[in-house]
């Protein structure tokens, strides 16, 4: 069949026929990204020159080993698909890589530049293909890349691998300054809580509620490096990463401790600005409270000098301590210790005056009863009975009647009442009664 085709074109040699077929095939099936047109022409000329030097070519002979020379075939037969050219239907490198990890919304699609290239924590696929999330927009972590060449796993399989708490999680903003790290880590902890990872966050005692898994540690490591670039990390964070670049849990634990310290600092400042003292508590306790607050603030970098501390203390004084505001307000070099010496002096004076007073306060009802008993005991009625009297059969009524009749009868004894009021009155009656004037 081949000899018949060649006999129809006697003026064309076998080599040139092969070259023409090859040129046609390369032109129609060439990959536009492979080689340029000038290179193809050079390859065609070299192939034509090599084939023209051959005298005879049998029909069943093998094709010369030329990577750009295809075997002579009819034009209708397509070229082989397993040739050396990269075909357009082949998968790209990004498509051949795994579509991502099977947890927490495919973290492989998150962009980051690792601090250290570790095979264990290196992301799958080239980093240049990862989409960049803007810091102001909460782009879901499971959002596929907008590039047309990337094809990831369908959403149904991704949903089954994600946690059931929230399908879309707003990522934290990008860290742009070391001074913003305390505020940024708060948003990052919130991001972990929304990603169903609240159990691995260290508590107040520095220990998490549950043990972190390897996949969760990988996710923690990758997301931390994505949104917190190394050039914007504080020095103490870099020191931790220099020892172990995967110890993100230690960074979170230290951050929580610093948050608590910041809260304590705020509470100390509020307490110092709202001090109140009127002597109701011991001066020693008040001094200890104030000095401890000032020492804590100074140790945490918030320096309170003597002038500011004295102003805050004197502003809260009241009662007898209030005059300290005016006696020493012009002394610029007054220290906190000197101010507390004055406070102690006033407190001790108050305690001394209180100790000099009687401790027991008399009840008004008791004072009334005591006054009655006092008159009865100091000025009692003097009644001297006659010891020789044997008959006491008269009633009290009769005796009282005799006393009244004897008082009404005029006698020399009654005149003695007007003469002297200090001497006892002696009534000459049978009862022999002696009464003082004050008892009437």
UniProtKB/Swiss-Prot annotation:
Keywords: Cytoplasm, Phosphoprotein, RNA-binding, Transposable element. GO terms for cellular component: cytoplasm. GO terms for biological process: viral translational frameshifting. One of its GO terms (molecular function) is RNA binding. It comes from the Eukaryota. Residues 1-10, 48-60, 127-152, 419-428 have a biased composition (Polar residues). The record marks 401-402 as: Cleavage. It is found in: Cytoplasm. The C-terminal RNA-binding region of CA is sufficient for all its nucleocapsid-like chaperone activities. Homotrimer. This is Transposon Ty1-DR5 Gag polyprotein. It comes from Saccharomyces cerevisiae (strain ATCC 204508 / S288c). The lineage of its organism: Eukaryota, Fungi, Dikarya, Ascomycota, Saccharomycotina. The gene is TY1A-DR5.
């Amino acid at each position: 069949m081949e000899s018949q085709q060649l006999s129809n074109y006697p003026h064309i040699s076998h080599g040139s026929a092969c070259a023409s077929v090859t040129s046609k095939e390369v032109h129609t099936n060439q990959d536009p990204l492979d080689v340029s047109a000038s290179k193809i022409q050079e390859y065609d000329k070299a192939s034509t020159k090599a084939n023209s030097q051959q005298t005879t070519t049998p029909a069943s002979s093998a094709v010369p080993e030329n990577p750009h020379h295809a075997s002579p075939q009819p034009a209708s037969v397509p070229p082989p698909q397993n040739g050396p050219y990269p075909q357009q239907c082949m998968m790209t490198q990004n498509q051949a890589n795994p579509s991502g990890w099977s947890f927490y919304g495919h973290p492989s699609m998150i962009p980051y530049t690792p601090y250290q290239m570790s095979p264990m924590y290196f992301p799958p696929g080239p980093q240049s293909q990862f989409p960049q999330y803007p810091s102001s927009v909460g782009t879901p972590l499971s959002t596929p890349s907008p590039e047309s060449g990337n094809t990831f796993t369908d959403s149904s399989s991704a949903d089954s691998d994600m946690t059931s708490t929230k399908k879309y999680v707003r990522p934290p903003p990008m860290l742009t300054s070391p001074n913003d790290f305390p505020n940024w880590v708060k948003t990052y902890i919130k991001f972990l809580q929304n990603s169903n990872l609240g159990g691995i966050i260290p508590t107040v005692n520095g220990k998490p509620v549950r043990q972190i898994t390897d996949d969760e540690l990988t996710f923690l490591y990758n997301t931390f490096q994505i949104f917190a670039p190394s050039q914007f990390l504080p020095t103490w964070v870099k020191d931790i990463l220099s020892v172990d670049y995967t110890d993100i849990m230690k960074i979170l634990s230290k951050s929580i401790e610093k948050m608590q310290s910041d809260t304590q600092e705020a509470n100390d400042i509020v307490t110092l600005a709202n001090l109140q003292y009127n002597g109701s508590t011991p001066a020693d306790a008040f001094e200890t409270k104030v000095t401890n607050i000032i020492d804590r603030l100074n140790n945490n970098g918030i320096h309170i000098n003597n002038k500011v501390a004295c102003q805050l203390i004197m502003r809260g004084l009241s009662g007898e301590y209030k005059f300290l505001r005016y006696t020493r307000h012009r002394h610029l070099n007054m220290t906190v210790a000197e101010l507390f010496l004055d406070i102690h002096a006033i407190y001790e004076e108050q305690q001394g005056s209180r100790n000099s007073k009687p401790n027991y306060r008399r009840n008004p009802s008791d004072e009334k009863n005591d006054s009655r008993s006092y008159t009865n005991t100091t000025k009692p009625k003097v009644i001297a009975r006659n010891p020789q009297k044997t008959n006491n059969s008269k009633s009290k009524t009769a005796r009282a009647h005799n006393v009244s009749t004897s008082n009404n009868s005029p006698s020399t004894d009654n005149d003695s009442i007007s003469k002297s009021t200090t001497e006892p009155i002696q009534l000459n009656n049978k009862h022999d009664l002696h009464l003082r004037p004050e008892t009437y």
